[in-house]
């Protein structure tokens, strides 16, 4: 029977049962761009989908804290003007906002104190930031700060890992973003995300991604989950998102080798041009810094490291292909 058993379900020896008591850090990066969520609501016919995501996220965070009394959580928001810690509350926003008390109606007064502290802080900071962002929804140029929020999350993870070095704190990162029907992979800056991949690999921190709406494929985010042993899930609707959070996204890093996770059909491993930002399959590579280019840069210099390219090599690259004379004669006869 062992010969025909699915290798995914074969028994794996665990190093120690004591790892069950090791605390875990869950860091969540939430993209709260009002323009993206408004476009998603218009296409899907949903109302206040970002609120649905927030409610499901609160349940997910509470369940993570319930697994172990020493577990930690952090939530970072990515918006058009930068990033902000929603929990733990940053020092410059430590004051309570009494005017937002109506926004806390979804929290029970009889809730466990630790849950209540996290939920109240998260909701207060979220509504203050989201209302401020709504006033900038008509701004013509809005850049994605998702890569910056991921970098901040990994920085926070590294700091806590150093503080809890004696108990080997486990960590994982969850990214929740909303897609657009007109989105392009250029909005996700390739080099910062690659830096996040290298940092997460060194920290042994899996990066999971939930993408809601938009194109099913996301080149750089899929590369991120594949390289860090994470999970990538694309959802057409926010309905039932709590089911995905409580199943696929709740797998502890220590159990990912023995639990069958959702798999991606295919991952696009293409890179992006340093100059144009476009995704390219074939391009030029600087031999010094490995910078990828889709065009020959002006001045024959690398835009990343300023290395001077060999003029003879550039001349060969710019040289047009030579068509044999015999082929030209045949073409003329046919004409």
From Swiss-Prot:
Chief location bin: nucleus
Gene Ontology molecular function, alphabetical: zinc ion binding
One GO BP: regulation of DNA-templated transcription
InterPro entries in alphabetical order: TFIIH_Tfb4/GTF2H3, vWFA_dom_sf
Keywords (A to Z) from UniProt: DNA damage, DNA repair, Metal-binding, Nucleus, Transcription, Transcription regulation, Zinc, Zinc-finger
Pfam family, any one: Tfb4
ZnF endpoints (C4-type): 286-305
One Gene Ontology cellular component annotation held by this UniProt entry: transcription factor TFIIH holo complex
Subcellular localization: Nucleus
Function: Component of the general transcription and DNA repair factor IIH (TFIIH) core complex, which is involved in general and transcription-coupled nucleotide excision repair (NER) of damaged DNA and, when complexed to TFIIK, in RNA transcription by RNA polymerase II. In NER, TFIIH acts by opening DNA around the lesion to allow the excision of the damaged oligonucleotide and its replacement by a new DNA fragment. In transcription, TFIIH has an essential role in transcription initiation.
Family: Belongs to the TFB4 family.
Subunit structure: Component of the 7-subunit TFIIH core complex composed of XPB/SSL2, XPD/RAD3, SSL1, TFB1, TFB2, TFB4 and TFB5, which is active in NER. The core complex associates with the 3-subunit CTD-kinase module TFIIK composed of CCL1, KIN28 and TFB3 to form the 10-subunit holoenzyme (holo-TFIIH) active in transcription.
Protein name: General transcription and DNA repair factor IIH subunit TFB4
Species per Swiss-Prot/TrEMBL record: Candida glabrata (strain ATCC 2001 / BCRC 20586 / JCM 3761 / NBRC 0622 / NRRL Y-65 / CBS 138) (Yeast)
Gene name for this UniProt entry: TFB4
């Amino acid at each position: 029977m062992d010969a025909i058993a699915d290798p995914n379900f074969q028994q794996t020896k665990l190093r120690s049962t004591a790892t069950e008591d090791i605390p875990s850090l869950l860091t969540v990066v939430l993209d709260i761009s009002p323009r993206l969520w408004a476009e998603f609501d218009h296409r899907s016919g949903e109302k206040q989908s970002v609120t649905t995501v927030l409610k499901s996220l609160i349940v997910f965070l509470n369940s993570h804290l319930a697994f172990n009394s020493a577990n930690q959580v952090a939530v970072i928001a990515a918006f058009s003007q930068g990033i902000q810690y929603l929990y733990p509350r940053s020092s410059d926003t430590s004051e309570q906002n009494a005017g937002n008390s109506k926004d806390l109606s979804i929290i029970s007064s009889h809730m466990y104190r630790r849950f209540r502290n996290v939920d109240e802080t998260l909701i207060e900071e979220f509504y203050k930031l989201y209302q401020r962002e709504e006033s900038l929804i008509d701004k013509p140029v809005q850049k994605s700060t998702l890569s910056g929020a991921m970098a901040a999350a990994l920085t926070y993870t590294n700091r806590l890992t150093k503080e809890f070095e004696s108990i080997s704190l486990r960590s994982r990162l969850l990214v929740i973003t909303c897609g657009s029907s007109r989105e392009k992979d250029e909005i996700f800056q390739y080099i910062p995300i690659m830096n996040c991949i290298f940092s997460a690999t060194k920290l042994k921190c899996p990066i999971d991604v939930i993408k809601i709406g938009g194109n099913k494929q996301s080149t750089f985010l899929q590369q991120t989950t594949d390289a860090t042993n994470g999970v990538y899930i694309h959802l057409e609707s926010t309905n039932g998102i709590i089911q995905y959070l409580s199943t696929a996204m709740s797998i502890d890093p220590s159990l990912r080798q023995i639990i069958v996770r959702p798999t991606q059909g295919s991952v696009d491993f293409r890179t992006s041009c340093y100059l144009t930002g476009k995704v390219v399959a074939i391009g030029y590579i600087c031999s010094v810094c490995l910078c990828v280019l889709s065009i020959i840069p002006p001045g024959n210099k690398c835009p990343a490291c300023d290395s001077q390219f060999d003029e003879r090599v550039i001349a060969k690259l710019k040289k047009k292909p030579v068509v044999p004379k015999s082929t030209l004669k045949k073409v003329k006869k046919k004409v």
